[in-house]
């Protein structure tokens, strides 16, 4: 089972449904959210662990390919709610 290494160093089980929920919050429909979550899951399934930043990078890359507005919504949400500067952190 893949573990996610959170920004604070804690580890938790990789749960694809969390990706789906986050993408839904960005405005994408369920089918798109599930498709992106499945792609990301396939990217990491052979690994022992993955960092939260890596996951975010993968998710945003896929989201941007599909819809620039949903990508922007994710960034705005991270800035407003989570107080993160996601685009800068991922450079």
Feature map (PLM): residue ranges:
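Long, C-terminal-biased catalytic regions of enzyme "large/alpha" subunits
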Residues: 1-91
